[in-house]
Amino acid sequence: MAPETEVEGCAFCAIAQGRDRSVEVLCEDRDWVAFFPLKPATPGHTLVIPRRHVADLWKVDPPLGAELMAAVIRVGRAIDRALKPEGMNLISSAGEIAEQTMFHLHLHVVPRWHRDGFGKIWPIDDKFDDANLDDVADLIREECQTP
């Protein structure tokens, strides 16, 4: 099933279709829009979204995915040239457990500086038991055979 062009009530669809002018659009193209979120984590924190409604990254078709990655690179390079951050995060959450709150695909491009208040994005404690990592790798390798 192809993604819908627009979902009624989706705030990001309204931005993508140009109906919500309350956000600061930084750049855009035929397939995507880049803008500041309402509550940026750091100066320059930017969201890149597809114009077509897609719930998350794992539901995007490969051509649109390629367009979005090209957009992220373009936006990230612009942020890098303009703000000279010490680093950058690219974040995409899929599903409530991963803290997705807007169910329209969005990629966070977050410039980072020492002591920026953003904090660590990975757990500090080693809570993962990697005893069966070979089995997990085999399962993923098998599924990678399907596009």
Pin down the residues of each PLM region.
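HIT superfamily nucleotide-processing domains
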Residues: 1-147
